[in-house]
Amino acid sequence: MTGVKNLEILASLNKKIGLEEIAASIRRVGLDPLMKKPVGKYSLGMRQRLGIAQAIMENPSLLILDEPLNGLDKHGVREMRQLIKGLKEQGKTILLASHNQGDIDELCDTVCEMDAGVMTMIREESI
């Protein structure tokens, strides 16, 4: 299955999502020329981008992202950080789970630290 087909199937579950929204999410994550390839031939970074495209396609007010930058090269990390910052500037609420302190420092306003499934600290970041 291609990346485009993957997004089309997901979009078919929500009648409000059309080809325009699919194309926009593909462009926003930088997969435009690669979407005709089978997903099985995608690198880990390309799969991460596809996952982010799936998440933003519906234009949700809340995004839950679990290690969204894992597996991306330096260029991809930079691009996806910019995308996430842009989504925050649009007023989206983003719940981001990450072990990467750089991602946390650059992207998070409020940080909740957990240990063994228990919240141990909440702090406000000055971004």
Task: For each feature predicted by the language model, list its residue ranges.
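Q-loop/switch helix immediately C-terminal to the Walker
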Residues: 1-13
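Conserved ABC ATPase "signature" region
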Residues: 8, 17-34
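Hydrophobic anchor residue at the start of the ABC signature
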Residues: 52
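Conserved catalytic motifs of ABC-family nucleotide-binding domains
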Residues: 59
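Helix N-cap at the start of a conserved alpha-helix in ABC-type nucleotide-binding domains
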Residues: 74-75
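H-loop/switch region of ABC-family ATPase nucleotide-binding domains
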Residues: 98-99
